[in-house]
Amino acid sequence: MTAVFPAPAWLVGCGNMAGAMVEGWRAGGIDMSAVTVIRPSGKPVEGVRTITTYPDEKPAFVMLGFKPQKLDEVVAGLAPLVGAGTTLVSMLAGVAAASLRGRFPEAKAIVRIMPNLPVAQVQGVTAIYSADGNQDELHDVRQLMASLGMIAWCETEEELGVIGAVAAAGVAYVARFGEALARSGEALGLRSVQAQMVAEQTLIGTGAFAAATGSHMADIARQVASPKGTTEQGLAVLDAADGLQPLLDRTLDAAIRRGKELAAEAAARD
């Protein structure tokens, strides 16, 4: 089934992640004629009508695509326009569904999403949570997010936060790993540009291999590592007690902890 925006659909704000989603929808051939981007700057969004003030009609679909810190500034003008026929979709990190419900009490449904940057290439992961309906009842949202890649429908907001740390923030962590791999190659004598290209293609190729073969990452590591070979020696460093796993555990813990702090800050403003 082709994803279709309920009409009229508003995208309030269009930051980096919201812009990536628009790029992915357009790349996937989704009809954007029902969508209006509303942003104070009036900065155009390619392929989508962009205005600076809210239209007169009540929206059927609203997606919040600005920074969480601007929520209360936006609510004053937007909340009176969100009615019983409006599905409100939020990508605001750390702002709980209950906080959104308090600010938009008339909304038909409140849906939280956590997309990641590869949605722009229709290769994303989008976590979805709502207490106001299941996947069938919120099929418009499900189809729109599925058109950008993989979706993960969450049973709790805690699960949404964990997937956000693994997938949304995880893009930055994978990119930082690739950067570190390139720097290590450069330190061993590779030219800077060459090291970067090799590291990037290694990440791309590993993902493509996993997708094509259905192999788990652990299986790929075992395939590459010959007994007593060079790869095995390197993996021994990564697998040490103070190696990669505990480092990533601390990394995700820090991200999730910050998400909880943001949620507490938003709740304190309720």
Language-model regions: role of each:
Residues 18-23, 42-128:
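Rossmann-like NAD(P)(H) cofactor-binding subdomain of soluble oxidoreductases
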Residues 99-109, 125-162, 173-212, 258:
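Internal alpha-helical scaffold of NAD(P)-dependent oxidoreductase catalytic cores
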Residues 30-31, 83, 105, 146:
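Short conserved AdoMet
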Residues 161-172, 221:
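A short glycine-threonine-serine/GTX helix/turn-capping micro-motif
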Residues 1-52, 61, 123, 186-188:
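NAD(P)+-binding Rossmann beta1-loop-alpha1 motif at the extreme N-terminus of oxidoreductases
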Residues 2-5, 200-270:
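NAD(P)-dependent Rossmann-like dehydrogenase/reductase catalytic/cofactor-binding core
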Residues 35, 191-198, 220, 231:
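Small-residue helix-packing motif on alpha-helices
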